[in-house]
């Protein structure tokens, strides 16, 4: 997540992330276990761009808890979501007349991107982002159809 802000020194940008809402439409983060899924930035004076370098979040929804100048100053162009994933050449594509199938394939691609950050994980949003061997071996054929993942898997297996 990259933020483009204009603020005064000491003002705060505070965001929370979630992938689902509960039945009442509230943020639901119990599935994150102990992961905080928070983005807290203290501004300096003037225009600024902030992009964390040591973390990432898996999310569908963002809640703005605090914003420089007040919540009423929030605009969509203040935020850019960035897909963080290992660099692999895309090799597999699917497009057909069935919109549901096209969406399913798109979700598979995005799921792979979100779970291929140096190691193959089973979820990018929780407190554990470990390269479990079971998930990786079940998905390897699909992964290699979607992307040229040979170097990715070779590196990961050597690390084991």
What are the functions of these language-model segments?
Residues 138-149:
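Well-ordered alpha-helical scaffold segments within catalytic/enzyme domains
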Residues 1-125, 134-135, 149-160:
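Extracellular/oxidizing-compartment recognition motifs
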Residues 126-127, 139:
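Hydrophobic, small-residue-rich membrane helices and short re-entrant helix-turn-helix hairpins
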């Amino acid at each position: 997540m990259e933020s483009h802000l204009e603020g005064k020194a000491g003002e705060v940008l505070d965001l929370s992330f979630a992938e689902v809402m509960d039945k009442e439409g509230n943020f639901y983060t119990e599935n994150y276990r102990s992961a905080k899924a928070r983005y807290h930035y203290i501004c300096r004076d003037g225009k600024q761009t902030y992009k964390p370098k040591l973390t990432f979040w898996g999310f569908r929804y963002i809640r703005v808890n605090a914003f420089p100048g007040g919540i009423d100053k929030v605009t969509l162009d203040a935020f850019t979501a960035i897909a963080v994933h290992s660099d692999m050449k895309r090799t597999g594509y699917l497009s057909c007349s069935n919109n549901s199938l096209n969406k399913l394939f798109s979700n598979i691609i995005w799921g792979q991107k979100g779970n291929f950050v140096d190691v193959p994980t089973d979820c990018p949003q929780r407190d554990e982002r470990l390269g479990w061997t079971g998930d990786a071996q079940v998905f390897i054929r699909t992964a290699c159809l979607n992307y040229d993942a040979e170097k990715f898997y070779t590196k990961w297996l050597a690390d084991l």
